Amino acid sequence: MEKFTTLTGVAAPLDAANVDTDQIIPKQFLLAVDRKGFGVHLFHERRYLDDAETIENPDFVLNKPAYRSASILVARRNFGNGSSREHAPWTLLDFGIAPSFADIFSNNALGNGLVLVKLAEEEVDELFRILEADPGMKVTVDLVTMTCTAGERTWRFTLDPFRRKCLLEGFDAVSLTLEHEDDIRAREKREPAWLVPHVEDLKSCPV
């Protein structure tokens, strides 16, 4: 997972609450397990007028010229509710700013390096007004200072310290485990053999 400190990019205002994971990436596109190639299907039902994805919906925010290069998505409350699917953060994998996120989506997103910035409802309302007054405006998200800035306005946000550390240092579940491999092996040696089998023993076990 790549390290993250700051991002400055065009912010697209998706003025909708309760956007579920099926809207983010519909179930018919979940067959692949490679993380790449999902972006074209992002918001399939909203973004296209046909199933073949050849006719764009000109009214959808990401299809408007000012937001085609957007790397930040600003949404309303309860973004990412619905079924648990890692394909949703894979499909977005840039940024989301909203008053609240569904718990399962939040865990999947942060585990895949997708930073979720949660602001108060009134702060998100203000951010929407700023973006709507200046389409294509760039917003800066700074994980070091825990701030989000649009024009002359800056808001502070919070994030679980452990999650923040993982994002800043580029740790996912695997790399974080490997970082403590020596400690894990030392713990294994202190435990009874019948309680914690060693990795080498597991490799030799018949299936």
Can you describe what each PLM-predicted range is?
Residues 31-138, 143:
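Feature captures the catalytic cores and cofactor-binding loops of soluble hydro-lyases/lyases
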Residues 114-203:
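Acidic, glycine-rich flexible loop/linker segments
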Residues 1-32, 172-207:
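N-terminal, positively charged, Ser/Thr/Ala/Gly-biased leader segments
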Residues 25, 106-111, 151-153:
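Short acidic, glycine/serine/threonine-rich loops at helix termini
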Residues 18-19, 79-80, 162:
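Short, glycine-/Ser/Thr-/acidic-enriched flexible segments
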